[in-house]
């Protein structure tokens, strides 16, 4: 009898352990996870007669800070964390210039991305495009500092647009006709650099997938 009892105890103990692990997985493993977005600058430069010369190192640092702030503000309230990590599933680099690979002739664009549902995505944003556009759309009375800030906003907003393509690769976000939206198809507009932007048709799609868990959950 003792020989039969001992294996029975071991079997029951294994069942209890397996049940405990399953309960832990249900309680914790099924919780929505944070989505990491990698965002960083490669070496970039810009010079303009309107600015009176090239951008200084301190101005480039400010532009990066403002761009990161734009991304964080756009995705506030969602399970998204922005960092300079380069090993994230979703990532964007700011580079000097971006040419549209669909054309044989050089066509400069604000950015481009590729993404696949469930796998992530990667993309680039053109610093030259954002900086040049900020200069073009700046009103006559604006000073250098205001234009530098506009460059930061433009870079960040282009990154938000490209991240949206990666996060929602099948969503027709370019269908938006709201010029003050993140989804608008063109960065060649004054709203990209001056004033506030808002979400349009992508917002409910992003919230359905990335809404933050309730406080205390």
Regions found by a protein language model. Name each.
Residues 147-217:
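The catalytic-center signature of Zn2+-dependent metalloproteases
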Residues 57-175:
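Metzincin-family zinc-dependent endopeptidase catalytic domain
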Residues 41-43, 86, 187:
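A mature extracytoplasmic/lumenal domain signature
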Residues 13-33:
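Bacterial Sec-dependent signal peptides at the C-terminal "C-region" and cleavage site
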């Amino acid at each position: 009898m003792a020989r039969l009892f001992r294996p029975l105890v071991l079997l029951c103990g294994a069942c209890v352990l397996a049940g405990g692990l399953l309960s832990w997985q249900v309680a914790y493993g099924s919780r929505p996870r944070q989505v990491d977005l990698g965002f960083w600058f490669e070496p970039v430069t810009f010079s303009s007669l309107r600015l009176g010369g090239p951008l200084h190192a301190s101005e480039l640092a400010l532009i990066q800070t403002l761009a990161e702030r734009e991304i964080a503000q756009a995705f506030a309230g969602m399970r998204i964390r922005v960092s300079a990590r380069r090993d994230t599933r979703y990532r964007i680099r700011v580079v000097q210039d971006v040419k549209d690979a669909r054309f044989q002739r050089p066509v400069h664009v604000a950015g481009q991305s590729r993404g696949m549902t469930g796998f992530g995505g990667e993309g680039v944003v053109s610093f030259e495009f954002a900086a040049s556009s900020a200069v073009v759309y700046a009103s006559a009375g604006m000073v250098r500092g205001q234009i530098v800030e506009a460059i930061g906003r433009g870079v960040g907003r282009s990154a938000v647009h490209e991240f949206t393509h990666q996060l929602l690769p099948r969503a027709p976000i370019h269908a938006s006709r709201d010029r003050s939206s993140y989804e608008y198809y063109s960065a060649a507009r004054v709203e990209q650099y001056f004033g506030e932007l808002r979400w349009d048709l992508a917002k409910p799609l992003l919230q359905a997938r990335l809404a933050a868990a309730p406080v205390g959950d």
